[in-house]
């Protein structure tokens, strides 16, 4: 072999080595993005062993572990609920079908679904038939081994004592009579108390008005023999569970809701805990239990984003504190927080599940986070071409 061939051979080997190094670095970066990123920076995003189904966990109750109260199962062990919320059932009733609930339970591995029954905006107050969708949804949740949150969705006006919401007690009485002490059901009494067209102020006085509304309903449910978990909203669109610290509701199975949207509120703000995360921590540190019954990957409007890095920070915070959560929303609306693309049917088909490319960016992300698997987004560059 002459000198020219030797040099050519060394050049060829050298290029192979360089190529191998480049490939290994690419693979390493991919691993960091899809696996080590989740496990090292956010260790509580991977795994869902605490996300137990009703058939295993049974009746829910508040328990105390190491001096802090949290949600527990019938055996006294901690449990976390993860799942999805419907959008307004007056707008997206098509999601109430067995194929959808089956896909959420089996493919997404959700153990809870929230049925958002708006009262205003074309909801229950003007169209009582929307209640039938709630009943149908409860039946499907039970059939598909999920807990179900019955959400009295107040929003506009923001005072749960307003005349438009006067049917609340009778509504919950009817549901409780139809499903007496059913272990699957969680009652959410007031979605988001707020100052819109109301005097629900962002302070103790505002909380007292919410409490005044909630207590008679809670007493009625307990007098009927229902031991179910009951969730109560709080001022400023359910971002102030801390306001109940000095005057909590006297009931052993009451939880306080917290809502946030990752494009509008961060866990960390200027190196310190953000205001909503801080409010949640204060509630927990003072003996209350918190359930995030609504959060979105978008801005608070439901659109913009999705803000997935911020979502990772939030879910790490929630999972590490065993706080249950429900994502907004099961809709094919053209907005960032919707779980499905506008072209996707809310019925995946008999015996079928939604393909990942039928999900929005938010839906794809949240599905992975409910399942507790690494988030590996598909390429969307060629979709629709």
From Swiss-Prot:
PROSITE patterns: GLYCOSYL_HYDROL_F5. It is a single-pass membrane protein. GO terms for biological process: cellulose catabolic process. Thermostable endoglucanase that retains activity in the presence of high salt concentrations, suggesting it might be used as an industrial enzyme for cellulose-based substrates. One of its GO terms (molecular function) is cellulase activity. Its main location: membrane. Substrate binds at residues 87, 91-92, 118, 153, 261, 300-301, 328, 333-335. One of its GO terms (cellular component) is plasma membrane. Activity is enhanced by 1mM Mn(2+), but is not affected by 1mM Ca(2+), Mg(2+), Zn(2+), K(+), Na(+) or Li(+). Activity is not inhibited by EDTA (in vitro). It is found in: Cell membrane. The chain crosses the membrane at residues 6-26. It is an enzyme of class 3 (hydrolase). It comes from the Bacteria. Signal peptide: none annotated. Keywords: Carbohydrate metabolism, Cell membrane, Cellulose degradation, Glycosidase, Hydrolase, Membrane, Polysaccharide degradation, Transmembrane, Transmembrane helix. Belongs to the glycosyl hydrolase 5 (cellulase A) family. Thermostable endoglucanase that has high activity with soluble polymeric substrates containing beta-1,4-glycosidic bonds, such as carboxymethyl cellulose (CMC) and barley beta-D-glucan (in vitro). Has no activity with cellobiose and filter paper. Has no activity with substrates containing beta-1,3-linked glycans, such as laminarin. Likewise, lacks activity with xylan, galactomannan and pectin. This is Cellulase CelDZ1.
